[in-house]
Amino acid sequence: MVVVLTIPAWGQADSAVERFYKGNQVRLIGSAGPGSGYSAWTRFIGQYLGRHLPGEPAVVVQYMAGAGGLIAANYMYSLAGRDGREIASLAREAPALSLMHAPGVRYDSLKLNWLGTPTSESNICVVGRNAPIKTLDDLYGKETVVGTDGIGSGMHMFPVALNALVHTKFKVIDGYSDSGVVLLAIDRGEIHGACQSAETLLHARGDAIRSGDLRVVLQGGMRPNPKFPGVPFVLDLARNEEQRLALRFLYSSQTFGRPYVAPPEVPPERVAALRQAFTDMFRDKDFLADAARQDYDVNPISGDDMTTLIGELAKTPKPIIDEVAALIAPPSPR
């Protein structure tokens, strides 16, 4: 008697993926400077991801900062290897910037392989204790000088859009190397404040926020953040449905938190393995305990769900997308 053993296709794929990654290195690219909240998360992810990938490859973190994350996003789309050994942390605004065909964008967010995000977030605008901005009304009546880490980042996009849509008076100063340097500029009194990830600010300057050295004057996202009761919520500032839809599209990027991607054209079985590794890592008790010790909120979204959400975002009416794109576009050279 001859016994034929049939190995399921998924088993063969798992074995092939393990053979590929075993003894290899995975390059994890950080798209922001080393002092930023993105990079803190990237280093943290780099400590745990390899143990959840088949073959347990070493994960090496390298930085490719600049232009609010666009340099890394463009690299991942056009130049990164397609074998699954290069992945990256991108700016949460990356999907929206692609859909808006923003200046400097040379990637298609619908073709990138989204792997997951450890957290969904909100954006808050903060000012230093001595800034002349005390209330929401002051944002309309007084110039508020805010710093950013580049025109491709939310630190730039949100105040610019708010100026156009609801007539705040933010003066935006671009060109700081990363969000950590922006915070130092607030400390030195060079600028009044910044509009930045709530998680980043709570992690880096939670004591200052609690003491009032940094004051939260506005919050934005898909819903109010319960950590900031009584702070004005950006969607409530909309004066009509068109403004509300535009603000909702712009702030939808907060949902993506700290997104991780692989390039297009990576073999599907390796994309699946990378996505599963992120999902397993987000459930890892050691990972969760370590995150809690460092005051990181873990509220993950899977790569599959991110892909679905970005597809839904792409269905936003084109006039709304075009309006938001026009709001955040840099001025034409004279």
For the regions a language model picked out, list residue spans one by one:
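Bacterial N-terminal signal peptides
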Residues: 1-8
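A short beta-strand structural signal in non-transmembrane regions
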Residues: 257-263
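A conserved hydrophobic position in a structured secondary element of the catalytic/binding core
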Residues: 127, 229, 262, 282-283
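Cleavable N-terminal signal peptides
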Residues: 9-13
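Structural beta->alpha junctions
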Residues: 33-34, 263-268
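An extracytoplasmic/periplasmic, membrane-proximal ligand-sensing/linker region
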Residues: 22-24, 212, 217, 266-334
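Conserved hydrophobic/amphipathic secondary-structure segments
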Residues: 14, 18-257, 329-333
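Generic detection of intrinsically disordered/low-complexity segments and helix-coil linkers/edges
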Residues: 4, 14-15, 243, 281, ...
